[in-house]
């Protein structure tokens, strides 16, 4: 079962950190672009090759210290077919090194369309889990739930997202007197009961932003069986203190994603005087180690058992 495998990988790596592979060509080190453009030309093919080579370096640097990577499809989809090739090659390479792969695709559409999206990702051996958007209703996410159970995959449904504008819809109060995100949370928690693993968590999880710690505290109680995928740490402003209530009393229950703060760590004030662009991957590894240590120390301070 997906969730059991994820928890076991977190235990083995002693880290709940997920590295987000959201590469931007304008921030890719020049030496990587030079190699890629020489191979493929200074065109869409060359750009896509550069993104893949950049990702490959990050994966090589972190595969032994994190349980999973999250690949945001938009950063590849922007370059058409060649970008998709880089997306799939990245997933394939990560899998070859034993990493779990989360495809961050945030799919949400009517049921018949959802079946095709599910076929594309959850029936693909390269991906262990995907993100989905449940805000069109329960019927629109059931194809993903059914395939997750059938193929031992996972889904993370958007519940309370990390962006500032999430309040525009998610924080509206319903006629029942609760926030929209709470209604969605209860729906996802109920559905999650159909895919509980041996550690008490479900393969049907939730996306809960690090930038809303008070809401996360409420949602941890509302969704006791759901593992949280937590974006918003680092570059978006989420801190160690903000994410503590995403975890349960045993130090599990959440994976914390960091994208820009890790993959471009060599450009940050903390690391820029230590690592050059040629050492971007080493800087990413150093940032993951630092982040993992801070999270685990935070869990210890909260009298939790560290991962």
From Swiss-Prot:
Q: Which InterPro entries match?
A: Aldolase_TIM (IPR013785), OMPdecase_type-2 (IPR011995), OMPdeCOase_dom (IPR001754), RibuloseP-bd_barrel (IPR011060)
State what protein this is by name. Orotidine 5'-phosphate decarboxylase
Q: In which pathway does it act?
A: Pyrimidine metabolism; UMP biosynthesis via de novo pathway; UMP from orotate: step 2/2
One of its Pfam families is OMPdecase
Recorded hits in Gene3D superfamilies, A to Z, give:
Aldolase class I (3.20.20.70)
Its GO biological process terms?
'de novo' pyrimidine nucleobase biosynthetic process; 'de novo' UMP biosynthetic process
- Give the reaction(s) catalysed: orotidine 5'-phosphate + H(+) = UMP + CO2
Note the HAMAP family from the entry: OMPdecase_type2 (MF_01215)
Primary enzyme class: lyase
Q: What is its EC number?
A: 4.1.1.23
Gene it is expressed from: pyrF
Active site at: 106 (proton donor)
The similarity annotation says:
Belongs to the OMP decarboxylase family. Type 2 subfamily.
Q: Which GO terms describe its molecular function?
A: orotidine-5'-phosphate decarboxylase activity
Q: Which UniProt keywords apply?
A: Decarboxylase, Lyase, Pyrimidine biosynthesis
Q: Where is the signal peptide?
A: none
Which NCBIfam families does the record associate with it?
pyrF_sub2
């Amino acid at each position: 079962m997906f969730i059991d495998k994820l928890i076991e990988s977190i235990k083995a790596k002693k880290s709940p950190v997920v590295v987000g592979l959201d590469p931007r060509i304008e921030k890719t080190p020049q030496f990587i672009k030079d190699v890629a453009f020489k191979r493929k030309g200074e065109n869409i093919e060359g750009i896509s090759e550069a993104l893949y080579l950049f990702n490959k370096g990050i994966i090589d640097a972190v595969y032994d210290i994190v349980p999973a990577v999250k690949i945001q499809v938009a950063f590849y989809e922007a370059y058409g077919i060649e970008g998709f090739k880089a997306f799939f090659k990245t997933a394939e390479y990560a899998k070859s090194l034993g990493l779990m792969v989360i495809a961050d695709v945030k799919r949400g559409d009517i049921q018949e369309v959802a079946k095709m999206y599910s076929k594309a990702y959850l029936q693909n051996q390269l991906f262990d889990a995907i993100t989905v958007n449940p805000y069109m209703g329960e019927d629109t996410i059931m194809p993903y739930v059914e395939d997750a159970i059938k193929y031992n995959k996972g889904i993370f449904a958007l519940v309370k997202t990390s962006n500032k504008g999430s309040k525009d819809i998610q924080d509206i109060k319903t006629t029942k007197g609760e926030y929209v995100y709470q209604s969605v949370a209860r729906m996802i928690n109920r559905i999650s009961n159909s895919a509980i693993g041996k550690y008490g968590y479900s393969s049907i999880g939730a996306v809960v932003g690090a930038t809303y710690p008070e809401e996360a505290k409420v949602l941890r109680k509302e969704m006791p069986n759901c593992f949280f995928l937590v974006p918003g740490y680092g570059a978006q402003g989420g801190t160690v203190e903000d994410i503590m209530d995403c975890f349960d009393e045993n130090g599990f229950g959440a994976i914390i994603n960091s994208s820009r703060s890790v993959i471009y760590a060599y450009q940050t004030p903390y690391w820029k005087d230590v690592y050059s662009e040629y050492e971007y991957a080493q800087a990413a590894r150093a940032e993951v180690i630092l982040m993992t240590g801070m999270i685990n120390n935070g869990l210890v301070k909260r009298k939790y058992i560290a991962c």
